[in-house]
């Protein structure tokens, strides 16, 4: 498992399996989520032997910034990131008077096939792990030197088509020991996968759910959003 996808409890179990005390997990969590370490070598309060075990068993991967476009009007920044496997995703940083909002991706490509969206032109390549989704936020916080206050899951991909990883991400990003962004400051946008919406509702999260309609009737919506035929 990607180490950034681990909850604090999972990290404690991993540390114990490597012969380390559970408190090491909190140190690791702090380095990844607060100090935004880019490598294990930066984690100087961990022993060299432990760092070597981590490198061997849980390679620490980070997003690579390929390009940034910044608006001269309001300072909005659009990032192009390269993942560890060479695939690329986009994220957006938006600065407002009430705080900093980010729009993040949940997949490489998309298989929903909405005719107005370029994200699905080549279909879905793969889904992002919870840690990769989280890493978009961690990178932009480190790059800006400022904290994110609002999250919108409205970038590339259909979040509910990556249900398990997105759900885990929501728990990670709102974890009190992590970057602790309140769930009421998180919005998830979906094209309307009805059964996953019902599953999400049963989780009793405090996030905002936005359903993209894009049409006033079923006939028009089906002509531009194939998902409407499956979930009219």
Report each predicted region and the residues it spans.
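Short linear Ser/Thr-Pro motifs
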Residues: 71, 105-106, 119, 189, ...
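Canonical Radical SAM [4Fe-4S] cluster-binding loop centered on the CxxxCxxC motif
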Residues: 95-132
């Amino acid at each position: 498992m990607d180490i950034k996808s681990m909850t604090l409890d999972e990290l404690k179990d991993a540390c114990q399996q490597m012969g380390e005390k559970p408190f090491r997990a909190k140190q690791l969590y702090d380095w990844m989520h607060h100090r935004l370490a880019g490598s294990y070598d930066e984690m100087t309060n961990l022993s060299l032997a432990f760092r070597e075990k981590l490198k061997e068993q849980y390679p620490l991967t980070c997003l690579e910034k390929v390009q940034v476009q910044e608006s001269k009007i309001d300072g909005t920044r659009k990032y192009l990131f390269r993942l560890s496997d060479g695939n690329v995703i986009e994220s957006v940083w938006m600065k407002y008077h009430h705080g900093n909002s980010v729009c993040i991706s949940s997949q490489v490509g998309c298989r929903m096939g909405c005719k107005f969206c370029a994200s699905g032109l080549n279909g879905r390549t793969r889904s992002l792990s919870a840690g990769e989704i989280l890493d978009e936020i961690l990178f932009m916080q480190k790059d800006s030197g400022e904290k994110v206050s609002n999250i919108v899951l409205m970038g590339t991909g259909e979040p509910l088509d990556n249900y398990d990883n997105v759900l885990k991400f929501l728990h990670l990003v709102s974890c009190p020991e992590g970057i602790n962004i309140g769930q009421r400051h998180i919005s998830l946008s979906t094209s309307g996968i009805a059964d996953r919406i019902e599953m999400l509702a049963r989780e009793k999260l405090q996030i905002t759910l936005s359903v993209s309609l894009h049409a006033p009737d079923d006939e028009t919506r089906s002509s531009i959003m194939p998902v409407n035929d499956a979930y009219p």
